[in-house]
């Protein structure tokens, strides 16, 4: 059979979720009005939705199964162009918020919670890993460091 790589931090093989259909133009039932789609993305972004949520809303309520087939670029790119979105890339921000949650939990009388202690270590490893990638891409300053005590300031 096919040799599958293991999942990160698990002893399981990775069996992927759903895969998108291979198409290179938007289906005829979909909304292909590029201006309207772009405006929707900007509006939803201003309303504070994450790019993942925006994609789901566009898919479920506005008949846009795939923004890239309509606009030729990603939702995150559109948001960045209209300078909406945080200082940090979204995936990294989500991990940082998760880390803050675990730190709060461990700090409020649960310092012996070993499973979550490990969860925090894993989350922080993922943050550092992403940070290295974003530094190489030039989306983070090269002197940026992950510091647990400064994390709250970064997230807010």
Where do the protein language model's features map onto the residues?
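Short, Lys/Arg-enriched N-terminal segments with co-localized hydrophobic residues
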Residues: 1-4
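Compact, Lys/Arg-rich rRNA/RNP-binding cores from ribosome-related proteins
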Residues: 7-156
């Amino acid at each position: 059979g096919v040799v599958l790589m293991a999942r990160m931090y698990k002893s399981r093989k990775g069996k992927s979720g759903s895969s998108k259909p291979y198409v290179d133009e938007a289906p005829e039932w979909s909304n292909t009005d590029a201006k309207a789609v772009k405006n929707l993305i900007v509006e939803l972004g201003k309303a504070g939705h994450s790019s993942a949520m925006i994609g789901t809303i566009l898919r479920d309520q506005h008949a846009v199964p795939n923004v890239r087939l309509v606009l030729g670029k990603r939702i995150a790119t559109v948001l960045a162009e209209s300078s909406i979105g945080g200082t940090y890339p979204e995936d990294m921000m989500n991990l940082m918020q998760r880390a803050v949650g675990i730190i709060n939990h461990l700090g409020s009388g649960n310092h012996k919670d070993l499973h979550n202690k490990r969860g925090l270590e894993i989350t922080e490893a993922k943050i550092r890993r992403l940070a290295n990638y974003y530094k190489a891409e030039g989306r983070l300053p090269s002197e940026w460091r992950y510091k647990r005590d400064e994390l709250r300031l970064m997230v807010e």
